[in-house]
Curated annotation (Swiss-Prot):
Extent of the signal sequence: none
Recorded family membership: Belongs to the PTH family.
UniProt key word Hydrolase: yes
Domain of life: Bacteria
Pfam families documented for this protein: Pept_tRNA_hydro (PF01195)
Active site (catalytic residues): H19
Listed name of the protein: Peptidyl-tRNA hydrolase
Chief site of localization: cytoplasm
Annotated gene: pth
Any one GO MF annotation of this record: peptidyl-tRNA hydrolase activity
Organism listed in the record: Halalkalibacterium halodurans (strain ATCC BAA-125 / DSM 18197 / FERM 7344 / JCM 9153 / C-125) (Bacillus halodurans)
EC number from the UniProt entry: 3.1.1.29
Site entry (Discriminates between blocked and unblocked aminoacyl-tRNA), positions: N9
Catalytic activity of the protein: an N-acyl-L-alpha-aminoacyl-tRNA + H2O = an N-acyl-L-amino acid + a tRNA + H(+)
GO terms for biological process, alphabetical: protein quality control for misfolded or incompletely synthesized proteins; rescue of stalled ribosome
Length: 185
């Protein structure tokens, strides 16, 4: 079994914001794999499917970003899954819009959703895809930036990054992660 988690904030007012790019990627994976995300468990919306006989779960925590761990850990426990089976997708201010980075483990890097996951899982040793959303513009706060929408000139780049991240997430279900990293980094 594999669990692919996209981080974001619940509610229509956050749709399309930089902070919700994890949700956008999970939605793209769902379209690629023909999985409906409409079931509810562990404070999250999820869907399930199979790839080459292996069960795959897609999860969008509904706890708000800074409490994401409150959804992911119970979900893993319910299905008796290990942290090794987890891939987390989230926004990263330190990467330009359109860039993605895959890592086998790492720190929270100041990201509150990742801080929550690390605290609730008791480890930072889980796979992740960081999707670049760039730094705030001069005079713009981090909160304004991540809860804001993409500028028109960024839309093509973020769309490509979402598609590439979805492709990488699908590859995670089929191949060793080191191979996936070598392909997509």
């Amino acid at each position: 079994m594999k669990l692919i988690v996209g981080l974001g904030n619940p509610g229509a007012k956050y749709d399309g914001t930089r902070h919700n790019v994890g949700f956008d990627v999970v939605d793209a994976v769902a379209r690629r794999l023909n999985i409906e995300i409409k079931q509810s468990k562990a404070n999250g919306l999820y869907g399930e499917g199979r790839i080459d006989g292996e069960k795959i779960f897609l999860l969008k925590p509904q706890t708000f970003m800074n409490r994401s761990g409150e959804s992911v850990r119970p979900f893993l426990e319910y299905y008796n899954m290990e942290v090794e089976d987890l891939l987390v997708i989230y926004d990263d201010l330190d990467l330009p819009v359109g860039k993605i980075r895959l890592r086998q483990k790492g720190s929270a890097g100041g990201h509150n959703g990742m801080k929550s996951l690390i605290a609730h899982l008791g480890t930072s040793d889980f796979k992740r895809i960081r999707v670049g959303v760039d730094r705030p513009a001069p005079g713009e706060t981090v909160v304004q930036h991540v809860l804001g929408r993409y500028r028109p000139e960024e839309k093509d780049a973020i769309s490509e990054a979402i598609d590439l991240s979805a492709e990488a997430a699908e590859a995670f279900t089929k191949k060793p992660f080191l191979e996936v990293m070598n392909t997509f980094n």
